[in-house]
Amino acid sequence: MTAREAFRNAIELMQGPARFMGLMLPGVGIFREFDELNNKLEAFRLFEYADRELNLPDDPVWSLYSPVRLALAKETFRAIWILEGVAHHYGTSGARRLENTLSAGVGLDLPLRTMISLHAGLGMAFASRALGALGSNPNSASIKDAIARFVEMCRVNCRPGWDDASIEPIGVVARTMYPGLLNPIGDAMASLGTPLQRLYWHGVGRALYFVPSNFIPFAASHSRALESALSEPQSGEDRLNAVAGLTWAVTMVNLPQPAVVREMMTVCAQRGVRPAFINGLVSALLAWRSMAPDDEKYLRPYLEPMRGPGDAALWNEMVVGPVSEARRGIYPGLEANHKLASVYTYRTMGELQSLAYKSNQEPL
């Protein structure tokens, strides 16, 4: 047995007790935290072992078409992580120079619902390549060169209009694998323009949900992750993007368990970052709508008002209202105008609404 297979077995072994505990009183107290742990483990397992889930050959030279079709035959919530893993596996296999992966040939035939996952997976692969080649003590010039190559790699492989979806994951890779270079990489991204700086910190925020100190969802892990999202970036706008990215990750991973999202909502409300939470939640659910256009099962709980004491008023204000508005008044315009990748940057609801219905000829 290889080390990789042994690690997979260890993940599955941990999932057993987590599932059992989560089934006892789902969504309640510590049992909710076991649900959350299982969700994290499952998302990671499906991403990291997508090739095993689909029984792909070990030979890295394969087309994306067949694996994508196999992944789409899976249950939708599982498929999104497998698709991301497929693209990551494809982007890291071998030393070949990839070009036009999703913009020509087979890539043009892949359905819209796969674009979020596939661009994210490719971006993770390209970021890992670029940052992994830096060595142990890179100077600012070499970091800037690596970032420039990474951005170029993303742009020559993206479907038109989807650059942001593959560039944002460099923040995930930087924060999880190279935390000591977090600010130098951020400076290099900023040197290429404010839009890339925003994407970077959104990715950093997503990473904070998965770093070791926050991975096990016990002992106020949401509060710790939020504190990092507020303290690690150096500017207010970067903090908004980091909190939005963190909320995105919490929402997407725990989509079947709204109670987990409700806990994150409460923490964000207490810290006074409601707009960033709303953007992260709405953006994740807009992405989900793109990935699962026919879904009602998972989305429905986020559209249902709560009644009674406790968090009901907060839920209706921070979740039901914005999600209903986004579903009805924002998503159709983003899809029609090919701007779905804009959900990777913090924007207010008004800015999203405006962006959704701008002419394609206007700059973003």
Provide a role label for each language-model segment.
Residues 1-364:
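Mature, well-folded catalytic/scaffold domains that follow N-terminal targeting or propeptide regions
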